[in-house]
């Protein structure tokens, strides 16, 4: 009646463990890169757009309060139905769930770093006539890097 369920051949052989570990690392890496891009973009817009800030932070707070496991059935069903009969749907679902498990905290961390940056640092970029692009790459991203990295590691520590 419905779409065929993907046939997943999982071998119990010890020889396959490195391959399965590699797949897990790739999933985590892809989800991390997507989370980082989203968190930086979302946090930057929320920090520098006063009109959108209150709404964006409220949405982020609501999304952060929803447990990741509550997304599991819907996400996996949606991904398997979008790409029926393929392993890709399950992999995309796993990546999306890893993404939702870490992105909200990373976005809050980046936003908080931008909001708590000392005024003197911003003034220094004005004195040296940095463009917005230079200010982002040479001040804001490095300044928030430690907080975002720590948040990412803290999220994984709690998930494992």
What is the meaning of each model-derived region?
Residues 14, 18, 52-56, 92, ...:
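Alpha-helical membrane-protein architecture signal
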Residues 61-101:
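Generic hydrophobic transmembrane alpha-helix motif, especially the helices
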Residues 1-33, 88-91:
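N-terminal, non-cleaved signal-anchor transmembrane helix
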Residues 1, 29, 33, 37, ...:
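Hydrophobic alpha-helical transmembrane segments of multi-pass integral membrane proteins
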Residues 18-30, 60-64, 145, 149:
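Alpha-helical membrane-interface segments at transmembrane helix boundaries
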Residues 151-159:
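Conserved small/polar residues in nucleotide/adenosyl-binding loops
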Residues 109-148:
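Short cytoplasmic-facing helical segments at TM-TM junctions of multi-pass membrane proteins
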